[in-house]
Amino acid sequence: MEEINVSIRNIQHYLYCPHRWGLINIDCSWVENYFVTKGNIIHSRVHDPENSYISRNKRVITSLPVYHDEMGIYGVVDCIELTKSANGVQVSDLPGTYHISIVEYKPRKPRDKDFNEDDAIQVFAQKICTDSIFRCDSEGILYYSDVKKRIRLPFHEQYQDYLKRIRQLLTEIREYTMKGEVPPVRKSQKCSGCSFQDMCMPKVLVMKRHSNFRDMIEED
């Protein structure tokens, strides 16, 4: 299954909801709503090559394609910050050495915690790719636009835990892809804000009605 390359965007969709991921990738469906559109607007500000710039001792690069051949994952990093550091790494033909930070932009910060764990896993996947390309130990940062706050992620302290989780997700994604199966519905709080709700939940209701009807017949 390692021959199946998986995009980081696919990992993100699978984390949000495996069934929704299956509708997008197996059934090839896509529906946008307010939350999707808002996310696209926020990303459009950073996914623009003209937004790359230099500020004092920091070079900022946006929309950077990254990949990891061994793990078979790839994607685009919102923003890479290169800060001059004596303990950093060399980057291409740039003079000096740099500390590398990955910054992922998100629209809303969770109310009851510092960061969304699914967001952190997405950034960790970007880190794996970035570290492989630049041969570094990059820092992961989430920027939540609603509170205008940067959150540094605990990758150094929990590296093995995140690595194990990523490998587990890749195995599941590749298994469903090979079988051509859409994962079953798992109803959660995310359903109310999902753009696929009208496509997904009616199917569940119909299945329940059919099941109830069969039960009535069997009882008779």
Residue ranges and their predicted role:
Residues K58-L170:
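Mg2+/Mn2+-dependent nuclease catalytic core
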Residues C129-D220:
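Metal-dependent nuclease catalytic regions and adjoining charged, substrate-binding loops involved
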Residues M1-I102, R111, H210, R214-D220:
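Metal-dependent nuclease catalytic cores that hydrolyze phosphodiester bonds in DNA/RNA
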Residues I4-I11, N116-D118, V182-Q189:
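Structural motif
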Residues Y14-Y16, Y105, Y143-Y144, F196:
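Aromatic side chains
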